[in-house]
Structures are given as C-alpha cells and as structure tokens.
Curated annotation (Swiss-Prot):
Swiss-Prot/TrEMBL GO biological process terms: protein folding
Family recorded in the similarity comment: Belongs to the UreE family.
GO cellular component: cytoplasm
Name of the molecule in the record: Urease accessory protein UreE
Keywords, in A-Z order: Chaperone, Cytoplasm, Nickel, Nickel insertion
Organism of derivation: Actinomyces naeslundii
Molecular function, one GO term: unfolded protein binding
Subcellular location: Cytoplasm
One Pfam family hit: UreE_N
Gene3D superfamilies on file: Urease metallochaperone UreE, N-terminal domain, UreE, C-terminal domain
C-alpha cells in the first residue's frame, strides 16, 4: 500500500479512541523523518510505501500512516546518539555556541523545564548529534555535558546561510 498523506497523530487522539485498536509501529531513525519517498515495515510485518508530496511536513513521532478496520500504523522514533550541552555561564554558552556553530553542526535547544538525566538543574541545553571531536572540545573546555540516546522531536537540519 502507498501512503500519500498522514492521517493525523496518535498523540492528538483521545484515549477512548484507542481502546480496542490494534496499533503497529514503524520505527524510523531521525534522518528518515525528512524522506518523502521510502519503503517501511511495521513491527507486525505490514509493508508500506510512503510517497509524500513535495512541501509536505516532515514525519514526526506518532504520525498515523495507515488507519483502517484492522487498526493503525504509527511512526515511532529510534533514539539518536546525542551530546547534551548544559553551559553554566553566559560566556561558556557563547563560546560553545560560536565554536560549534563555526563547524556548522545542527543543534536543537531546550529550556530548563525539559528533563535530561544527569544534567538536573540546567538553565537550558543545546543538543547536537554525537561527534567525538565536539565531545573532546567540550571536555577540554570543562563544559558540563552528557552523551545519551534520545528521541528528538524534529530532525537535525542545517540552516541555510551565506558567508
């Protein structure tokens, strides 16, 4: 079966809508959320082709690929190997952001309310895909950070820019 559009998101459905519903999952790595055309297989063996229109939003955790009388098939994210950076001072944040930005490493930012085990009490974090040279740099500077597996809410992307 070819999927050409998303049928909503499981996280937007009321709990009672999911009672007695057979739920299958398609586990995707973060990078595959941006792919418009791909072939996937659910954890129950259902094969699907995905062919989304150009300009369609990226896939995200919980997107419903298929909904029929047998149940639903949803997108689940494979955890990503990331470095979570929790600078203590504004100067430390500026130095790290400047140097990692010069390396064009895509980053995501989270506020103090977002929990990151091992970095409790942070004032905000910067998250990048794991890179051993970035980790070495952070260790050299003595910046508080942790390597962890995490399901990221959106894919890492490079921002367009010019020099």
């Amino acid at each position: 079966m070819i999927i050409e559009s998303i049928s909503g998101n499981i996280h937007d459905l009321p709990g009672e809508d999911l009672e007695d519903v057979h739920v299958e999952s398609v586990v995707l790595p973060l990078a595959d959320l941006t792919k418009r055309i791909q072939r996937v297989r659910s954890d129950h063996g259902t094969e699907l082709g995905i062919r989304l229109a150009p300009g369609a939003p990226d896939l995200r955790e919980g997107d419903i690929l298929l909904r029929n009388e047998r149940g639903i098939v949803v997108v689940r994210l494979e955890p990503t190997d990331v470095l979570v950076i929790a600078p203590v001072t504004v100067r430390e944040m500026g130095v790290v952001a400047h140097n990692l930005g010069n390396r064009h490493l895509p980053a995501q930012f989270f506020g103090p309310a977002e929990p990151f085990p091992g970095l409790e009490g942070h004032d905000g974090v910067m998250v990048i895909q794991y890179d051993h040279t970035a980790e070495h740099y952070l260790e050299h500077l003595g910046v508080r950070h942790a390597r962890m597996e995490r399901s990221m809410p959106v894919p890492f992307r490079h921002a367009e820019h010019t020099h």
